[in-house]
Amino acid sequence: MPKRIMKGVVVSAKQDKTAIVRVERTFTHPMLKKIVRKTNKYHAHDENNVAVEGQTIAIRECAPKSKLKRWEVVAEEGTEA
């Protein structure tokens, strides 16, 4: 089974080897027929501490690394000022 990959913005990179990433998705509400934006925050494993707050990164699903971490940082996209 392929691993899911998502893109999101780093909200916090204060913890050692951990980045909290906000991922936003849009969908059409089934009853209201309006476009709805939903955000989720994921704890991602950042082995080399490369993530910076405000940066857009890609995260990939992985085996559990701790109580909350089930994702790992794959690639950096760039920074948003």
Swiss-Prot record:
> Which Gene3D superfamilies does the UniProt record give?
Nucleic acid-binding proteins
Q: Which Pfam families match?
A: Ribosomal_S17
Q: Name one GO biological process term.
A: translation
- Molecular function via GO: rRNA binding; structural constituent of ribosome
Q: Which SUPFAM superfamilies does this one have?
A: Nucleic acid-binding proteins
This entry carries the following GO cellular component terms, namely: cytosolic small ribosomal subunit
Q: Provide this UniProt record's keywords sorted from A to Z.
A: Ribonucleoprotein, Ribosomal protein, RNA-binding, rRNA-binding
Q: Which family does it belong to?
A: Belongs to the universal ribosomal protein uS17 family.
Could you describe the subunit structure of this protein?
Part of the 30S ribosomal subunit.
Q: What does this protein do?
A: One of the primary rRNA binding proteins, it binds specifically to the 5'-end of 16S ribosomal RNA.
What is the protein named? Answer: Small ribosomal subunit protein uS17
Species per Swiss-Prot/TrEMBL record: Hyphomonas neptunium (strain ATCC 15444)
